[in-house]
Curated annotation (Swiss-Prot):
Homodimer. Heterotetramer of two MnmE and two MnmG subunits. GO terms for biological process: tRNA methylation; tRNA wobble uridine modification. The lineage of its organism: Bacteria, Pseudomonadati, Pseudomonadota, Gammaproteobacteria, Alteromonadales. FAD binds at G13, G14, G15, H16, A17, G18, V125, S180, Q370. NAD(+) binds at residues 273-287. Belongs to the MnmG family. PROSITE patterns: GIDA_1, GIDA_2. This is tRNA uridine 5-carboxymethylaminomethyl modification enzyme MnmG. The gene is mnmG.
C-alpha cells in the first residue's frame, strides 16, 4: 500500500535530530515528511532538562545561526539561564539553560506545525526501500509505503533498545516507549558496521519530599542571558533556582553494597557508556579516593514537582536507588517518582558516513544523532540540521556542504566522527576544537548565517536582523580605528584618570580599548568617546574583536600553516607523560603507536586535533620542531 503523495525528504524520528532535520529540509523548500511513532512526544527532552553548556552551547548557537529551532525553543522554555566560564576568555564561555520540559516540547511542536513544506505523520518505520544502491522510501509498521529519494534516519536510542533496572531488563526505546526492533533488524542487513552503546538517567524525585534548606541555592545570572541571536529576555518564563548537594561515604557504601546486582558490573550490559557522564556506580568505582560527588538538584518545570538529580544516573535496583537517594543531605525523606535506568541501543560506525552524513554505501540515506555514536541533545540537533540540509541539497541536485573544523564546532563534530569514529558516546567539549578562539558562541552568526542564507536555511527576517547587527559592528570598528586622541587633546582630562599609564603619544580609540584596564562600556561612558552601540551583543563583538585581534590573527595563521606539519618528526624517545595538556587517553595511544611524524599521529584512532596542536607547541618550545627527512 503506497501513500498518495511523494516527498522529497523523509525524516524518521521526532527527537532533537529529527526535528532539526525536518525543519531544515522544509525551510529549503523540499517537500518533507516527518514520521514518528508518537506525535505527542515530538521535541521530548528524554533525559536532563537542560540545553547548552561547555561546547554544547556553542553547537546550539551554531544551530541557531543556521536558522534552527533549538535556541528559540530554549528561550521560551528556559527557567534558569547561566553563562558558564564567565570569568574566563570568550572562547570557553558557554550559555546553559534549565528548561521546562513541557514548555520546550510545546514550542518545538508549534514550530513544526507552522513550518511550510512539512507534513507530520504518526507511524513507526519498519523497513527501508533500497533499489540499486539508492534509497527510494520507507515502509511503516502497518505496511504503508512512503516514497522519497532522500531519507534521514534519527532513531535515537530506539534501535533494539533495552532498558535495565537492576537485574531486570526489557525492550524499550526509552521509559514508556517501544523500541524499533524491525527497523534495527533491517539496518543490520546493510553494509555498515554496527555496535552497541549505553546511556542512563537518574531517578526523578518528588520536590515535596526534599528539604531544600539543607542544600546550597544556585540562582541564575542577572542580567539574564539569551540563547537565540534573535531571542529576547521577554520570551523567558518565570525563573527559578537550582540547588547543590553532595553524596557522602554512606552513599558510596550503599552503592558498593549493591554492585552485585548492578547490570553494569554483572556483565549484563555490554554497551559502552559515556566517559564524561558516568553513572554514579561508575564514579564510585573509578574515583574510589573521592569521599563525595556533587549533585545538582534541577527542577523539570514550573508546573511539576519532579526533580532531576543531575549526577546520580544509575541502573541499580530500585531498593538501592531509594537508599542511596535518602543518604544524601536534604533528601533523607525523599520519594522517587520514576526510577533511574540504563538503556542499551544500536549505533552505526560514523566512519561509514560522508561528511554530509550520507551513508557511503547507500545513496540518499542519511544518519543523524545518537545512531552515529553521539550523546546529547545539542550534538543530535546539530547533526540533524546538517543531514536535513544535505538531503535537501541532494534532491535539488546541488553539492553537499559541511563546515570545516576552523569554521564551526559542527565541523569539528562531523570530522571527528567521520574520520576517527567512536567507541563510546561522543560529546562535544571546547577542548576538541583546536581553533576555539575563532569558534566562540558570540560569533556563531558571523561565521555561519551568511552561508545559511545562501543555502536557504535562513529566512529573510533573520537575515535582515543579522545584516543590521553586522553592519553596526563594522561601522563601530571603523569609528574606533579612525578617531584619535593626541597628547594635547582635552579628552585626556577624562581619559587619563581611567588609565594605568597616561597617554604620552597619539592613540586611536581602538588602541585605548586594547588596554587591559579598559573595556568598551567604560570607554564609551567617558565624555567625547561615545555614543556606545545600543545592541549589547554587537557591542560585545566589538570589544572581543579589538581586544583579541592579535590572538585571532595568530590562530588564523595556524590554520593556514596546519597542512605543513604532515612530515614534522616526532622523536621516538619523546616522553608523552611530560607533555602538558595531553589527556591520559591520548598519552596511552601515543605510547602504544609511537608515531614517527605528526601526520602519523593525527591518523591514530581517537587522536584529537587539539592534541596535535599541543604536540606542536611542545616540540617548538623544546627546539624539536623539524621535518622528518624519511617522510618528506
Amino acid at each position: 500500500m503506497h501513500f498518495h503523495e511523494r516527498f522529497d525528504v523523509i525524516v524518521i524520528g521526532g527527537g532533537h535530530a529529527g526535528t532539526e532535520a525536518a525543519l531544515a529540509a522544509a525551510r529549503m523548500g523540499s517537500k518533507t515528511l516527518l514520521l514518528t511513532h508518537n506525535i505527542d512526544t515530538l521535541g521530548q527532552m528524554s533525559c536532563n532538562p537542560a540545553i547548552g553548556g561547555i561546547g554544547k552551547g556553542h553547537l546550539v548557537k551554531e544551530i541557531d545561526a543556521l536558522g534552527g529551532a533549538m535556541a528559540i525553543a530554549t528561550d521560551y522554555a528556559g527557567i534558569q539561564f547561566r553563562t558558564l566560564n564567565s570569568s574566563k576568555g570568550p572562547a570557553v564561555r558557554a550559555t546553559r539553560a534549565q528548561a521546562d520540559r513541557a514548555l520546550y516540547r510545546a514550542k518545538i511542536q508549534e514550530i513544526l506545525q507552522n513550518q511550510p513544506n512539512l507534513r507530520l505523520f504518526q507511524q513507526a518505520v519498519d523497513d527501508l526501500i533500497v533499489e540499486n544502491g539508492k534509497v527510494t522510501g520507507v515502509v511503516t509498521q502497518m505496511g504503508l509505503a512512503f516514497e522519497a529519494p532522500a531519507v534521514v534516519l534519527t532513531a535515537g536510542t530506539f534501535l533494539s533498545g533495552k532498558i535495565h533496572i537492576g537485574m531486570q531488563n526489557y525492550s524499550g526505546g526509552r521509559a514508556g516507549d517501544p523500541p524499533s526492533i524491525a527497523l534495527a533488524d533491517r539496518l543490520r542487513e546493510l553494509p555498515i558496521r554496527i555496535g552497541r552503546l549505553k546511556t542512563g538517567t537518574p531517578p526523578r524525585i518528588d520536590a515535596n519530599t526534599i528539604n531544600f534548606d539543607l542544600m546550597t541555592e544556585q540562582k541564575g545570572d542577572t542580567p539574564l542571558p539569551v540563547m537565540s541571536f534573535i531571542g529576547d529576555v521577554s520570551h523567558h518564563p518565570r525563573q527559578v533556582s537550582c540547588f547543590v548537594t553532595h553524596t557522602n561515604e554512606r552513599t558510596h557504601d550503599i552503592i558498593r553494597g549493591g554492585l552485585d546486582r548492578s547490570p553494569m558490573y554483572s556483565g549484563i550490559i555490554e554497551g559502552v557508556g559515556p566517559r564524561y557522564c558516568p553513572s554514579i556506580e561508575d564514579k564510585i568505582n573509578r574515583f574510589a579516593d573521592k569521599s563525595s560527588h556533587q549533585i545538582f538538584i534541577e527542577p523539570e518545570g514550573l508546573n511539576t514537582n519532579e526533580i532531576y538529580p543531575n549526577g546520580i544516573s544509575t541502573s541499580l535496583p530500585f531498593d538501592v536507588q531509594l537508599n542511596l537517594v535518602r543518604s544524601i543531605k536534604g533528601m533523607e525523606n525523599a520519594e522517587i517518582i520514576r526510577p533511574g535506568y540504563a538503556i542499551e541501543y544500536d549505533y552505526f560506525d560514523p566512519r561509514d558516513l560522508k561528511n554530509s552524513l550520507e551513508t557511503k554505501s547507500i545513496q540518499g540515506l542519511f544518519f543523524a544523532g545518537q545512531i552515529n555514536g553521539t550523546t546529547g541533545y545539542e550534538e543530535a540537533g546539530a547533526q540533524g540540521l546538517l543531514a536535513g540540509m544535505n538531503a535537501s541539497l541532494q534532491v535539488q541536485g546541488k553539492e553537499s556542504w559541511c563546515p570545516r573544523r576552523d569554521e564551526a564546532y559542527l565541523g569539528v563534530l562531523v570530522d571527528d566522527l567521520s574520520t576517527l569514529g567512536t567507541k563510546e558516546p561522543y560529546r562535544m567539549f571546547t577542548s576538541r576544537a583546536e581553533y576555539r578562539l575563532l569558534l566562540r558562541e558570540d560569533n556563531a552568526d558571523l561565521r555561519l548565517t551568511e552561508k545559511g542564507h545562501q543555502i536557504g536555511l535562513v529566512d529573510e527576517d533573520r537575515w535582515a536582523k543579522f545584516n543590521k547587527k553586522r553592519e553596526s559592528i563594522e561601522l563601530e570598528l571603523q569609528r574606533l580605528r579612525s578617531q584619535w586622541v593626541h597628547p594635547n587633546s582635552p579628552l585626556l582630562e577624562v581619559l587619563n584618570p581611567e588609565l594605568n599609564t597616561p597617554i604620552s603619544r597619539e592613540a586611536s580609540f581602538e588602541d585605548l580599548l586594547r588596554r587591559p584596564e579598559m573595556d568598551y562600556p567604560k570607554l564609551m561612558s567617558l565624555e567625547g568617546f561615545g555614543p556606545a552601540l545600543e545592541d549589547q551583543r554587537a557591542a560585545e563583538q566589538v570589544q572581543i574583536q579589538v581586544k583579541y585581534s592579535g590572538y585571532i590573527q595568530r590562530q588564523q595563521d595556524e590554520i593556514d600553516k596546519a597542512i605543513k606539519h604532515e612530515t614534522t618528526g616526532l622523536p621516538l624517545e619523546l616522553d608523552y607523560q611530560e607533555v602538558p595538556g595531553l589527556s591520559n587517553e591520548v598519552i596511552a595511544k601515543l605510547n602504544d603507536h609511537k608515531p614517527e611524524t605528526i601526520g602519523q599521529a593525527s591518523r591514530i584512532s581517537g587522536m584529537t586535533p587539539a592534541a596535535i596542536s599541543i604536540l606542536l607547541v611542545h616540540l617548538k618550545r623544546r627546539g624539536l620542531l623539524r621535518k622528518n627527512p624519511s617522510k618528506s
